[in-house]
Amino acid sequence: MSKEKFVRNKPHCNIGTIGHVDHGKTTLTAAITITLAELGGGKAVAYDQIDKAPEEKERGITISTAHVEYETEKRHYAHVDCPGHADYVKNMITGAAQMDGAILVVNAADGPMPQTREHILLGRQVGIPAIVVYLNKVDQVDDKDMIELVEEEIRELLTSYKYPGDKTPIVKGSALAAVEGRDEEIGKNSIIELMKAVDEFIPQPTRDIDKPFLMPVEDVFSISGRGTVATGRIESGVIKTGEEVEIVGVTATKKSVCTGVEMFRKLLDSGEAGDNVGILLRGVERDDIQRGQVLCKPASITPHTKFEAQAYVLKKDEGGRHTPFFTKYRPQFYFRTTDVTGEVTLPAGTEMVMPGDDAKFTVTLITPIAMSEKLNFAIREGGRTVGAGVVTKIIE
């Protein structure tokens, strides 16, 4: 079987279905693939293929996630759907499935439920820029006023988490009707309307290559007569020979110039997001740079030691801690390529964090790390992952 070539003729966007358990997220995912496949936008994927999602490991944490892809006239989409609530929490916090936008599924008969609220809150914390709502199972509600009340409740909930509740598209339908090919108005047509809303309301993300240059330093060596080389995988942007760079984190920020980019032992003029490269640096000694720092476009990122985080703490049976932790807990925080010790301060009113919780707290690191909001990290104790988190706000 030769692999199909991935043709990039449309902008790409990553989305996912979120919402309360049994409100129809997986059925909707199947309905989208089936409806768009009929219109020539990808392959139809059945419910049971999505539901038995494979397990993946991301930052030492096992997550079950199903990935499907499809196309509208406007975009190519990669779509994630998770079977369990804990998988969503882990996925959103570890950034395992980067979401540029989300489809919030709400059962019209139930209205917003606890996990509906939690997923919206997480979306806000991890920086999901836009949410579109699918009001599912509308054929199970006879009272039109009831549906209007639920819609109003969803808008208020979105607004309370700083999403534009009044402007958010809410599409009413039945994902099951679309899968079973009946009741076109609430079935197939609702899916077409939903995807139109997703196309228009979810903004096109900035591609990694269009962001400022950043490369986490993995290794450093000196080549006699040439200078110092830092190796790593370029996370974002483009680097060209002759451009200025900064070395940020751990110690005081230093400036240098890229005098060459190497890939597969060949010298290139430039490297871009996704490339594993060696970058030759002018006037930098072997000891001036170390793993844990980043090379970046000057003034694009700054080093910090204190931040607010949202984190998921592994349960005992996931290989996590057996006991809760309290303020003054001092694990290692693994950012990009390195562990840094930090101290946790829990918010007022939170006495402790139990294994299996997702929690908010403040961290103070012992050495500065180049960071910006939305940066993911693992929480480790002696090399063993006990949690994962995301920087939600930088303090100093």
UniProtKB/Swiss-Prot annotation:
Keyword match Protein biosynthesis: yes
Disulfide-bond pairs as recorded: none
Annotated segments matching region G1: 19-26
Catalytic reaction annotation: GTP + H2O = GDP + phosphate + H(+)
Residues given in the record as Mg(2+) binding sites: 26
Localization (cell): Cytoplasm
Keyword line: Cytoplasm, Elongation factor, GTP-binding, Hydrolase, Magnesium, Metal-binding, Nucleotide-binding, Protein biosynthesis
PROSITE patterns with a match to the protein in the record: G_TR_1 (PS00301), G_TR_2 (PS51722)
Cellular component, GO annotation: cytoplasm
Main location, first listed in the record: cytoplasm
UniProt family annotation: Belongs to the TRAFAC class translation factor GTPase superfamily. Classic translation factor GTPase family. EF-Tu/EF-1A subfamily.
Name of this protein: Elongation factor Tu
Source species of the chain: Pelagibacter ubique (strain HTCC1062)
Taxonomic lineage: Bacteria, Pseudomonadati, Pseudomonadota, Alphaproteobacteria, Candidatus Pelagibacterales
Gene: tuf
